[in-house]
Amino acid sequence: DIQMTQSPDYLSASVGETVTITCRASENIYSYLAWYQQKQGKSPQLLVYDAKTLVEGVPSRFSGSGSGTQFSLKINSLQPEDFGSYYCQHHYGIPFTFGSGTKLEIKR
């Protein structure tokens, strides 16, 4: 199975800041990479697929990049609704494994 290594595990940032989350695949997955946001008690919501394609309705402050084994999700000008957990997932071959997640919290 393809292993997905996500970092950091935890991120504390302020509204208005820019953050970047990274994901590394254990082998080449080309651009078959998705990013999800999950709020506590809710199902994950797809943000990005094919490494860089934003789902309709997702704000343009989100951007995905990368290919092969190295990927990133950048969030510009963080908004209060952006805080939660983020996961990468490859969709190259079954099983579609997830990264371990990044918890993004408001810096106090």
Curated annotation (Swiss-Prot):
GO cellular component: immunoglobulin complex
Pfam families named among the record's database cross-references: V-set
Span list, region Complementarity-determining-3: 89-97
SUPFAM superfamilies xrefs: Immunoglobulin
Region (Complementarity-determining-2): 50-56
Renumbered residue ranges of the record's region Framework-1: 1-23
InterPro entries, per the entry: Ig-like_dom, Ig-like_dom_sf, Ig-like_fold, Ig_sub, Ig_V-set, IgV_Light_Chain
Keyword set, alphabetical order: Adaptive immunity, Disulfide bond, Immunity, Immunoglobulin
Stated name of the protein: Ig kappa chain V-V region MOPC 149
Annotated organism of origin: Mus musculus
